[in-house]
Amino acid sequence: MAKLILTQEVAGLGTSGDVVEVKNGYARNYLLPRGFATVWTKGGEKQVESLQKARAARAVANLEDAQAQAAQLQSAPVQLERTAGAEGRLFGAVQTADVAEAIEAAGLGSVDKRSITLPAHIKSVGNHEAQVRLHEDVIATVQLQVVAAKAKK
């Protein structure tokens, strides 16, 4: 097992500054080459402690901001306009990047596409839901209205 310090958030593993133990192959072949982690040292541990103190102070402010944004996201549905066939099937699927753009266009704030989770592929016109992870403790459910785009003549 390899002991590492994460330099970025890794899904299912931790956030920046966390000390984790992973299998050697995962560390050697994935985390270290991509710059997601560095090797743990005693000096690095002191640096991690100072980073965690600073992060704890920021987390309180970020939590309040995330809760406010979650309330805003849940207050109104987000409308996405896509080209669709006669029976309501979309030409292509709605992606997380499309949802992020629609949220920003609706004036509900900026959301990273990697923090959006779609429960299933959205390939039809209608009402759907998406989960947005704004903070470790705050997950907002966004109502999506997918409508067919009007034909241009």
Swiss-Prot record:
Keywords: Ribonucleoprotein, Ribosomal protein, RNA-binding, rRNA-binding. GO terms for molecular function: rRNA binding; structural constituent of ribosome. PROSITE patterns: RIBOSOMAL_L9. It comes from the Bacteria. GO terms for cellular component: ribonucleoprotein complex; ribosome. Pfam families: Ribosomal_L9_C (PF03948), Ribosomal_L9_N (PF01281). One of its GO terms (biological process) is translation. PANTHER family: 50S RIBOSOMAL PROTEIN L9. Belongs to the bacterial ribosomal protein bL9 family. NCBIfam families: L9 (TIGR00158). Binds to the 23S rRNA. This is Large ribosomal subunit protein bL9. It comes from Micrococcus luteus (strain ATCC 4698 / DSM 20030 / JCM 1464 / CCM 169 / CCUG 5858 / IAM 1056 / NBRC 3333 / NCIMB 9278 / NCTC 2665 / VKM Ac-2230) (Micrococcus lysodeikticus).
